[in-house]
Amino acid sequence: MYKKSEIEIEVLPANEGDCILITIEKEDIYILIDGGTAETYRNYLKTRLIQLRNEGKEIDLLIVTHIDNDHIGGIIELLKENGSDMDSKIIRIKNIWHNSYRHLQFDKNQTLGKSEKNILNKIIANGEVSLNYNVGKSSPISAIQGTTLAGLIFEGYYHWNEQSEGQAIINNGINYQFGKECFISVLKPNISDLEKLGKKWKIDLKKSKYSFVFSEDKLFDDAFEYYCRCMLTDGNGNNEKICYSNHNTEEMTIEEISREPMSEDNSITNRSSISVIIRYRNKKLLFLADNIADDVLEYLSQEDRGYSLVKLPHHGSANNISDDFVERIESDTYLVSTNSEKYNHPDIETLAKIACKRTEYVKRIYFNYKIDKVADFEKKIYGMNDIEFVYLGEGQKIYL
């Protein structure tokens, strides 16, 4: 939290989501990872981006990790107001990384028929109804208006996945260079992840029509996005598939909590989210989106054990992190982005795993909201010399 070097991390209030701005000062590089909800954009992100624009700055890279309302809602609002790459009203965005329908790994060279169009239009219409119902319960003014992220990127002529020549952003062993000394490598997704996501999409569509044909028509992009945004919800916008920790930890020791068994997250969209390592000089930052930590481990070499910062996957869900990951990864700075209100993240089991790892250095876990159950758990770690919780106030940053 105290300025000591050349990287700044701003974790904007994003309710249950992510909106993270990374600044590499010496090279004037700005990286935005996700945009939280529409409310995040209106209340925080827009003001910050206009401030950067007025200082003559640009966003060098916008990473939209996956199609989920608490990650893309703010980006949709930003791109609506921003206009186009050639005439940016809010701020110039030089590159966007985002995997959409067009990046799924299967043939799409057929001709779209009338019945397929009707089915896709129904998916879009049902998606708008479902999302408006869900959003309206928490923020009545942020109604979904039928605009998709993929459509806005395409119609705004933004540089979309340009580093991979317009193809999917995947783990391909390449270190993408930004500026002189900043390099970004992709850990997830891999081709298999996108194939599985595409397979599920095809199976579900063929339930409506067995011989469903697939094309490059924009209608597919829009329908796929609504499909992913509603994949975790029922018709009323209620979450069906996220597993919650429901252990009563009040009378348990930290060690007992850390050993509580959890079910691994089986969400295909989460496993397809973009996780990256950002390297600058001697620093490495690990951003795990909503991925599963063990899926990432297989891509990390022994040299990749130490990190200046680890953004915990899926807002600190115990279903996305394991003992093996905590033991293998060395870091003194962890980050959790959530207000805990919708999905009850972070899980106390995750915090206990990190607290129970004995280190000669102090491990700091940063939160962008004060959360009651985290404060209660903090009482359990009182007196431990190698763990500290830090609550970021509005405008406060992490300095690395």
Predicted regions and their residues:
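Hydrophobic "anchor" residues on beta-strands that sit immediately upstream
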Residues: 9, 30, 62, 95, ...
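Active-site environment of divalent metal-dependent phosphoester hydrolases
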Residues: 16-18, 38-39, 67-73, 103-105, ...
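Flexible, acidic/histidine-containing loops and adjacent segments that form or flank the divalent-metal
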Residues: 2-3, 83-281, 363, 380-400
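Leucine-rich repeat domain C-terminal region
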Residues: 99, 331-335, 359-362
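Active-site metal-binding motif and surrounding structural segment of the metallo-beta-lactamase
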Residues: 42-96, 301-319, 328-333
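Long, well-ordered mid-to-C-terminal structural blocks that present hydrophobic/aromatic surfaces
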Residues: 260-320
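Conserved beta-strand hairpin/beta-sheet module of binuclear metal-dependent hydrolase folds
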Residues: 2-58, 268-292
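C-terminal regulatory/interaction regions
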Residues: 1-7, 15-18, 278-281, 291-309, ...
